[in-house]
Amino acid sequence: MARNEIRPIVKLRSTAGTGYTYVTRKNRRNDPDRLMLKKYDPVVRRHVDFREER
């Protein structure tokens, strides 16, 4: 398998509605569903949930 098939690059968009995004890689075998991570959003200056965007 190619490297990009196993660990594709995904965008994480803030659920606070600010439009702020993080870019990361995810492992499809361990996380077949959409990723949901709690990270810092500098626009609202607090930690919020970031959800994988397709």
From Swiss-Prot:
Keywords, in A-Z order: Ribonucleoprotein, Ribosomal protein
Source species: Mycobacterium sp. (strain JLS)
Family: Belongs to the bacterial ribosomal protein bL33 family.
UniProt cross-references to NCBIfam families, sorted A to Z: PRK00595.1, rpmG_bact
Domain of life where this protein originates: Bacteria
GO terms for cellular component: cytosolic large ribosomal subunit
UniProt keyword Ribonucleoprotein present: yes
Pfam families hit by this protein: Ribosomal_L33 (PF00471)
SUPFAM superfamilies: Zn-binding ribosomal proteins
HAMAP family: Ribosomal_bL33 (MF_00294)
Stretches assigned to coiled coil: none
GO biological process, alphabetically ordered: translation
Alphabetized GO MF terms: structural constituent of ribosome
Name the UniProt record assigns to this protein: Large ribosomal subunit protein bL33B
